[in-house]
UniProtKB/Swiss-Prot annotation:
<feature type="binding site">
    <location>
        <begin position="275"/>
        <end position="289"/>
    </location>
    <ligand>
        <name>NAD(+)</name>
    </ligand>
</feature>
<dbReference type="InterPro" id="IPR049312">
    <property type="entry name" value="GIDA_C_N"/>
</dbReference>
<protein>
    <recommendedName>
        <fullName>tRNA uridine 5-carboxymethylaminomethyl modification enzyme MnmG</fullName>
    </recommendedName>
</protein>
<dbReference type="GO" id="GO:0050660">
    <property type="term" value="F:flavin adenine dinucleotide binding"/>
</dbReference>
<dbReference type="InterPro" id="IPR036188">
    <property type="entry name" value="FAD/NAD-bd_sf"/>
</dbReference>
<keyword id="KW-0520">NAD</keyword>
<keyword id="KW-0274">FAD</keyword>
<dbReference type="GO" id="GO:0030488">
    <property type="term" value="P:tRNA methylation"/>
</dbReference>
<dbReference type="Pfam" id="PF21680">
    <property type="entry name" value="GIDA_C_1st"/>
</dbReference>
<dbReference type="InterPro" id="IPR044920">
    <property type="entry name" value="MnmG_C_subdom_sf"/>
</dbReference>
<comment type="subunit">
    <text>Homodimer. Heterotetramer of two MnmE and two MnmG subunits.</text>
</comment>
<dbReference type="InterPro" id="IPR020595">
    <property type="entry name" value="MnmG-rel_CS"/>
</dbReference>
<dbReference type="Pfam" id="PF01134">
    <property type="entry name" value="GIDA"/>
</dbReference>
<dbReference type="InterPro" id="IPR040131">
    <property type="entry name" value="MnmG_N"/>
</dbReference>
<dbReference type="GO" id="GO:0005829">
    <property type="term" value="C:cytosol"/>
</dbReference>
<dbReference type="InterPro" id="IPR004416">
    <property type="entry name" value="MnmG"/>
</dbReference>
<comment type="function">
    <text>NAD-binding protein involved in the addition of a carboxymethylaminomethyl (cmnm) group at the wobble position (U34) of certain tRNAs, forming tRNA-cmnm(5)s(2)U34.</text>
</comment>
Length: 626
């Protein structure tokens, strides 16, 4: 047993240096707090243990929001991606989502270097095994080597490491992701402090050798010609991109899986943890959708300096020899060489309703949770929570008001509100359908929504803020110009409109009104707009969206105004729900457990009815009129 010694004093200690831990540590340090980040292995900083991608549907929104607030994820992927695509372009702008294929090692190395060079930040390869708490307030952490680091706040960003258990068919052993060590001691410390834990499960597919793949039997998927960056600070990225490939399962794949389903830990009871609904294993897909003739499988490179390829959509915990047989049924993989075996991993996570909207634990002052510890899944969800936890831990130490994003502010607000208000019984994944105001929460306007907030907090630099103000002014000035510029029904203009399958003008209208026609866009009208200033492409895209969706946007703004009325009705911190006459027993229990900060949050708690909300509103009126 190690002899304890004084490791030093810090303002904030971050436990874990994955995507949540990196954002938390950088936010804290950049806000001037003396910060320590602890990781089991320095080489696992910003590790991508599963898919080699950043972004995707709804997740791309999160990355843009992290960037708009002054986080690092967007800039890091812009510097290290090997393919970029905008998804859902056939649909409306609310669901357009950027997705980039990462060079995994480059992504890690760059993020590690950013942390190493950051002022106010120290990094240690060390395992935290215990939290020190006095009188309900965190005072430090204890490590396996005996170091005691005193601090004012701790951010837990432990990923899937807490009591991690790897499962492959009949084989199981204690382990973290990607062959790393688990963290087996910290869970007990949390239990001793009264924190409620439960077991979740996730998994990752096999990795294969590129030399053994016949790409001629697959469908090639290229990146976009016009590369759109994640970060609002990145400009005009030109880069040679790699291809990804698409193949499909077939009857033979299904037969092998069905013949061996009894050896699947998911189906024979070996796995106790709850897995992600929206990222099922291939055996789960086959059994849950027996009538589906085939499933898409994506073959994606893991980087430029490796031949490893990721088999997306083929996550499994079946025995290794079964996995090899399954892989060889896929067109193009008949002679495949498996380099890494697919596995499932079980791990401890918390019930996130134990957290405040700031991500601080309700019953342990100065202790924050972020990422998969909180029951979420995904790099982007983790990064978003880490950023907010880092900001709020720093603001609390500075005795400033916390940053709480609402559901009408950001996808980050939806994510955190869902976790701390509703909780989750499975790994939570962000989706556009979870956001009520998604037309307002587009990925293209994240800076308009959040950069002012990031600037006020102190995380957005002057350079970024000046760039944002210039972009904002460009859009506002151009919209005003279009509203005041008339288009006359001249012959040449009507001929131009007819060429674009648009109706002739019967009377003079403004360019703004003309642009509201669905068949026209801002870039089309350049030919008849000689006064147009030279503006960046992203400004033109904003003009298109703001003109064409003006009515829908206004409608959602009105909905948000109603939503905010309830969000502004704050509930007293010391409220005793048992004393409020008229509340149902279930509502009293749920409200006492969640302890919502506002009537708005109370309305979203499962088990709290509209009648209960009416009782609360009457109570509040009497409370504030005393």
């Amino acid at each position: 047993m190690a002899v304890n010694y004084d490791g030093g004093q810090f303002d904030i200690v971050v436990v874990g240096a994955g995507h949540a831990g990196c954002e938390a540590a950088l936010a804290s340090a950049r806000l001037g707090l003396n910060t320590l980040v602890c990781t089991i292995n320095l080489d696992s900083i910003a590790l991508m243990p599963c898919n080699p991608n950043i972004g995707g549907t709804a997740k791309g929104h999160l990355v843009r929001e992290i960037d708009a607030l002054g986080g690092e994820m967007g800039i890091n992927i812009d510097n290290t991606f090997i393919q970029s695509r905008m998804l859902n372009t056939s649909k409306g702008p609310a669901v357009h989502s950027l997705r980039a294929q990462a060079d995994k090692k480059s992504y890690q190395f760059r993020m590690k270097r950013i942390l190493e060079e950051q002022e106010n930040l120290k990094i240690r390869q060390i395992e935290v095994t215990e939290l020190n708490v006095e009188n309900g307030k965190v005072t430090g952490v204890v490590t396996k080597n005996g170091a005691i680091f005193k601090c004012k706040a701790v951010i837990l960003a432990t990923g899937t490491y807490l009591k991690g258990k790897i499962i492959i068919g009949e084989v199981s052993y204690s382990g973290g992701p990607n062959g790393l060590f688990p963290a087996n001691d910290l869970s007990q410390s949390l239990l001793d402090l009264g924190v409620s834990l439960r077991r979740f499960k996730t998994g990752t597919p096999a990795r294969i050798n590129r030399r053994s793949v016949d790409f001629s039997k697959m469908i090639e998927q290229n990146g976009d010609d016009n590369i759109i960056p994640f970060s609002f600070m990145s400009e005009n990225i030109e880069r040679e991109q790699v291809s990804c490939y698409l193949t499909y399962t077939n009857d033979e794949t299904r037969k092998i899986i069905r013949d061996n389903i009894g050896r699947s830990p998911i189906y024979n009871g070996s796995i106790k943890g709850v897995g992600p609904r929206y990222c099922p294993s291939i055996e789960d897909k086959i059994m849950r959708f027996p009538d589906k003739p085939q499933h898409q499988i994506f073959i994606e490179p893991e980087g430029l300096d490796t031949l490893e390829m990721y088999v997306g959509g083929f996550s499994s915990s079946l025995p290794e020899e079964v996995q090899i047989k399954m892989l060889k049924t896929l067109p193009g993989l008949e002679n495949v060489e498996m380099m890494r075996t697919a596995y499932a991993i079980e791990y401890d996570s918390i019930d996130p309703t134990q957290l405040k909207p700031t991500l601080e634990f309700k019953d342990i002052e100065g202790l924050y949770g972020a990422g998969q510890l909180n029951g979420s899944s995904g790099y982007e969800e983790a990064g978003a929570q880490g950023l907010i936890a880092g900001i709020n831990a720093a603001l609390k130490i500075k005795e400033k008001e916390p940053l709480i994003l609402t559901r009408s502010d950001a996808y980050i607000g939806v994510l955190i509100d869902d976790l701390v208000t509703k909780g989750t019984n499975e790994p939570y994944r962000m989706m556009t359908s979870r956001a009520e105001y998604r037309l307002l929460l587009r990925q293209d306007n994240a800076d308009f929504r959040l950069t002012n907030l990031g600037y006020r907090v102190g995380l957005v630099t002057e350079e970024r803020y000046d760039k944002f103000i210039k972009r904002k002014q460009n859009i506002e000035n151009e919209l005003e110009r279009l509203k005041n510029l008339k288009v006359t029904n001249k012959k040449e203009i009507n001929e131009f409109l007819i060429s674009l399958n648009s109706a002739e003008l019967r009377k003079p209208i403004t360019f703004y009104e003309l642009l509201q026609r669905p068949e026209l866009d801002y870039f089309d009208l350049k030919q008849i707009d000689s006064e147009r200033p030279e503006l960046p492409h992203d400004v033109g895209e904003q003009i298109n969206i703001l003109t064409k969706y003006e009515g829908y946007i206004q409608s959602q703004l009105e909905q948000v105004a109603q939503f905010k009325k309830f969000e502004k009705k704050l509930l007293p911190k010391d409220i005793n729900y048992s004393d409020i006459k008229g509340l149902r027993t279930e509502a009293i229990q749920k409200l006492s457990d969640i302890r919502p900060i506002s009537i708005g949050q109370a309305t979203r708690i499962s088990g709290v009815s509209p009648a209960d909300i009416s009782v609360l509103l009457i109570y509040l009126e009497h409370y504030y009129n005393k």
